[in-house]
Amino acid sequence: MEQNNSLPPFAQGLASPQGAMTPGLPIFSPMMPYGTGLTPQPVQNSNSLSLLEEQQRQQQQQQAASQQQGGMVGGSGQTPQLYHSTQAVSTTTALPGNTPLYTTPLTPMTPITPATPASESSGIVPQLQNIVSTVNLGCKLDLKTIALRARNAEYNPKRFAAVIMRIREPRTTALIFSSGKMVCTGAKSEEQSRLAARKYARVVQKLGFPAKFLDFKIQNMVGSCDVKFPIRLEGLVLTHQQFSSYEPELFPGLIYRMIKPRIVLLIFVSGKVVLTGAKVRGEIYEAFENIYPILKGFRKTS
């Protein structure tokens, strides 16, 4: 095909088959005048992104990362939320005036001792029946000498490796060991337990031992009371399985292990209750006030 000589020189190159079909050929001519309205364009690779597209892609990634960080409220170490969880990323906002259905996170229940209503009081005061205390005499003891020279003392090492000594006032019993440790049991109050322990230490001193009175401590208190009505122990053990055990073929009472305060209660069908395991008197009273409304709920009607 012959070139059209009537066209300008730059247009002749564009109109030729070589100029139109040759890949990579610039679409402008060095002789192109400035008044044509065409600006020389650099040759670009079609596989590479433009700078504008790259910036847009980075901005989208940053926005997605910020949304994920803002939505991850319940991070590691927190209790999983039930129903209304805030861990899911959401782009919607709550309408003004709306409140969530649950104001606090829902967590699995943990076994706790049922609390007593503040308005309800039993009006019953448990009576202390026994107090166990310990004391350190601070010296080694010859148990045979104590058993031979002291009154109301017995010692049988084949049966028990301690001297068993008793006094009448307060009516208590002491277990005296060769290491100098002593256990006093049988007192009805804290003052009686301390007084009895001092009397036993005085007896040991009079026998020629350098006994002292160190580290006196109450280890256990036992109280009892009567609620004055029969109790359905079968229903109680079914409702409070995690706290109680009841084997009438082995023991006639229900064993209830309270968590706070840490007290063990023996509950009988007649309404008698024994409380043990306390270190101070107040724990006995608190445990009974906690259990009394529960016992009323299982009162026998006939």
Curated annotation (Swiss-Prot):
Residues 1-22, 50-81 are annotated as: Disordered. It comes from the Eukaryota. GO terms for cellular component: nucleus; transcription factor TFIID complex. The keyword Repeat applies. Enriched in testis but hardly detectable in the ovary (at protein level). GO terms for molecular function: DNA binding; RNA polymerase II general transcription initiation factor activity; RNA polymerase III general transcription initiation factor activity. Signal peptide: none annotated. It is found in: Nucleus. GO terms for biological process: DNA-templated transcription initiation; gastrulation; mRNA catabolic process; transcription by RNA polymerase II; transcription by RNA polymerase III. Transmembrane segments: none annotated. Pfam families: TBP. Gene3D superfamilies: TATA-Binding Protein. SUPFAM superfamilies: TATA-box binding protein-like. Coiled coil: none annotated. The keyword Amino-acid biosynthesis does not apply. InterPro entries: TBP, TBP_CS, TBP_dom_sf, TBP_eukaryotic. Residues 50-70 have a biased composition (Low complexity). Keywords: Developmental protein, DNA-binding, Gastrulation, Nucleus, Repeat, Transcription, Transcription regulation. Its main location: nucleus. Sequence repeats lie at residues 128-204, 218-295. General transcription factor that functions at the core of the DNA-binding multiprotein factor TFIID. Binding of TFIID to the TATA box is the initial transcriptional step of the pre-initiation complex (PIC), playing a role in the activation of eukaryotic genes transcribed by RNA polymerase II. Members of the TBP family are differentially required for transcription and development during early embryogenesis. Regulates mRNA levels in the early embryo by both transcriptional and post-transcriptional mechanisms. Required for transcription of a subset of genes at the mid-blastula transition (MBT). Belongs to the TBP family. PANTHER family: TATA-BOX BINDING PROTEIN (PTHR10126). This is TATA-box-binding protein. It comes from Danio rerio (Zebrafish). The gene is tbp.
